[in-house]
Regions:
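Long, contiguous amphipathic alpha-helices that act as assembly "spine/axial" helices in icosahedral shell
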Residues: 1-22, 53-69, 104, 144, ...
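Amphipathic heptad-repeat coiled-coil/leucine-zipper-like oligomerization helices
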Residues: 33-71
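Short, well-ordered alpha-helical packing segments
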Residues: 1, 46-50, 211
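Cell-envelope/extracellular anchoring and linker segments
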Residues: 10-49
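Sequence/fold signature of self-assembling virion shell proteins
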Residues: 28-43, 75-214
Length: 214
């Protein structure tokens, strides 16, 4: 999913889709000097989703962020981690938290750029709303079949069922590559921005991207 999100945020909207650019908020420093304004703060997520969809911001419910960003936010008491009690009755934190009423998934698969002599490291956070990712079943050539092994355990019958599921970012269209495409796209094809195009009013797309230095 993170690779798909990275791909669609690489799409450049034009004409009626030009406002797609408002769904990305980049607060990262242009140099190696990083201040509080370049990091995730108390109002960063709220400001980013308001910029993206205006009065549709109540749809947002889920945040994917890097552990570096999550650690900084927890240190500022802006992020609360959920807890569970293990078999030894010891309370332990989960890598799932809450911020601004939204569920936070901490995943180091979120895009990052390494620091170099000219710029500090950057971290990408994704914010998703209800219906941002659509799920649907895909066709299966043989959805179910019955097999029998007469020599096993006095005769053994097994019912085999198969399912295929798809997920798709709402508001975007995927174009099948002209080469290398078989029954379904590869991870690399899904991660390629060139295979995606925006087809819906950006204000109706409950996705936001935030780039910070922590």
């Amino acid at each position: 999913m993170l690779k798909i999100l990275n791909a669609v945020f690489g799409v450049t909207g034009s004409g009626e889709f030009a406002d797609w650019a408002n769904h990305t908020t980049d607060l990262s420093s242009a140099s190696t000097t990083v201040g509080d304004a370049n990091k995730m703060g108390a109002t960063t997520i709220g400001d980013a989703i308001q910029k993206a969809v205006g009065d549709n911001q109540d749809a947002f419910q889920l945040v994917f962020m890097h552990s570096k960003v999550a650690t900084n936010m927890a240190g500022l008491k802006l992020l609360d981690f959920l807890k569970y009690t293990d078999a030894n009755n010891v309370e332990r934190p989960l890598r799932i938290g809450t911020v601004n009423g939204m569920t936070v998934i901490v995943d180091d698969g979120c895009p990052t750029t390494a620091a170099d002599t000219s710029k500090a490291a950057t971290y990408t956070t994704y914010v998703l709303g209800l219906g941002a990712i659509q799920y649907a079943p895909a066709p299966v050539k043989v959805p179910s079949e019955l097999t029998r092994d007469a020599l096993k355990g006095g005769g053994y019958d097994a019912l085999v069922t198969r399912i295929r599921e798809t997920m798709h970012p709402n508001g975007f269209s995927f174009t099948k590559p002209t080469s290398g495409y078989t029954a379904s796209p590869t991870d690399a094809q899904l991660a390629a921005t060139a295979n995606w195009s925006i087809v819906a009013d950006p204000k109706t797309i409950a996705l936001a991207k935030i780039i910070t230095n922590g």
